[in-house]
Amino acid sequence: MEVEEAGAVQTGTGEAVVANERTKQCSAFASITGCDEAVAQCFLAENDWDMERAINSYFEPGVESTLQNKPAADLADPLKQEMHAVTSDACIDLTSDDLVATKSEAVTSNSSTVKQQEDESHFTFLTWNIDGLDESNVAERARAVCSCLALYTPDVVFLQEVIPPYCEYLKKRAVSYKIITGNEDEYFTAMMLKKSRVKLISQEIVPYPSTLMMRNLLVANVNISGNSICLMTSHLESTKDHSKERLKQLDTVLKKMMDAPPSATVIFGGDTNLRDQEVAKIGGLPNTILDVWEFLGKPEHCRYTWDTKLNNNLRACYTSRLRFDRILYRASMEGSQVIPQFLNLVGTEKLDCGRFPSDHWGLLCDFDIIL
């Protein structure tokens, strides 16, 4: 694509910078949506070069007529087809009792679900790397994630590796949740807070200055059943080679947890990419911060959240079983206590496409509120 044809002014240093930036935007848009750069240019120009608005516009149901007029070769792009199918679905209240009752035979009755939802003495929490960067079978996998939300109706959800189209899909499907994100471009973390249970007080994004992978710490101060809770999620630097940066990021997380007001319970959850030896290398966690899996007696059934022995999404030719996804907890030093009670894996059922919702298992945790 010629920059001149994109309508950019051809002269002047400042204008050249704008043209270069718009070229980059076209490339990023094309990468996220799977369209070619000419189509990207059209959507961006129509939306005043606002990336989020352009992506939302592209994935609106009204884009169907545009796609129908495109060559068959363009329609064959898997990501475009699947994400278009996803975002064409009607809005669904994922905490609806009827939906929960029909999503799985594991739910034996509506009454028990409703009772659980109305019980102010506990809340449920889910953290999950949903692998939005994997374009394969993304529609079926996204629906499976929403089925898990409908089944378990967690009050708080932390997600990692969310991409803009996936986020828009969740906003359309999960209308019972308020969704806040750690970024808007490329891929990022997100929190989903059930509107009927969780009151958002404030939010903050804490940067990791030396990250090479656009990682940060998303923080939300909330109130659940009268209890002040500081929620934190992050996707720490990936791969064994980036251990040093990962531990710097962990240090930021731990300091932020310890600096939270003493009246607040602090819950961190996310894809930490941590190896046990890395935690040992820094002398373990501070005395006031607990690893929930360890606190609950190291249950074997949910030890590994990254498990290529059982999860074939990566199609790895090796076996790797690691506890990448972790929940850390700092108790309130005043008033009522929020105590972790139970931990389980989600997303472990293979889908019709032969794959799982993500290459990670999700971690579902029940917390009791003790007055």
UniProtKB/Swiss-Prot annotation:
MF (Gene Ontology): 5'-tyrosyl-DNA phosphodiesterase activity; magnesium ion binding; manganese ion binding; nuclease activity; single-stranded DNA binding
Q: Which cofactor does it need?
A: Mg(2+); Mn(2+)
Q: Which InterPro entries match?
A: Endo/exonu/phosph_ase_sf, Endo/exonuclease/phosphatase, TDP2-like, UBA-like_sf
Entry keyword S-adenosyl-L-methionine? no
Residues that hold Mg(2+) according to the record: D131, E161
Q: Location of site Interaction with 5' end of substrate DNA?
A: Y187, W306, F324, H360
Q: Output the Gene Ontology cellular-component terms.
A: cytoplasm; PML body
Manner of cofactor binding, per the entry note: Binds 1 magnesium or manganese ion per subunit.
One record GO biological process: double-strand break repair
Give the protein name, as stated in the record.
Answer: Tyrosyl-DNA phosphodiesterase 2
- What organism is this sequence from? Xenopus laevis (African clawed frog)
Q: What is the lineage of its organism?
A: Eukaryota, Metazoa, Chordata, Craniata, Vertebrata
